[in-house]
């Protein structure tokens, strides 16, 4: 099981139209966990049952495009993608929030590491 985050972006649309499309998408896709939106972008989080990460990435890259007609989504493109395994996703949810980048060039131990 993979936890996928897709960010899409494109030409400005009424934010209410984007929200309505995401609501339709959530009815079509039971694995959709959450979505955020604005007039020029949206971010989706969902579970994927692909056998391997390559399958999850491939599916994620076509996810928005494949649902454009059925959910009446904006003609936006994927501009960001993250796929992590179930253990990584769950670990992130239970650990305190920490800035992704503290300083450029910084090298630090990962949270939950066994140093």
Question: What are the roles of these predicted feature ranges?
Answer:
Residues 1-115:
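Long, contiguous binding/interaction regions
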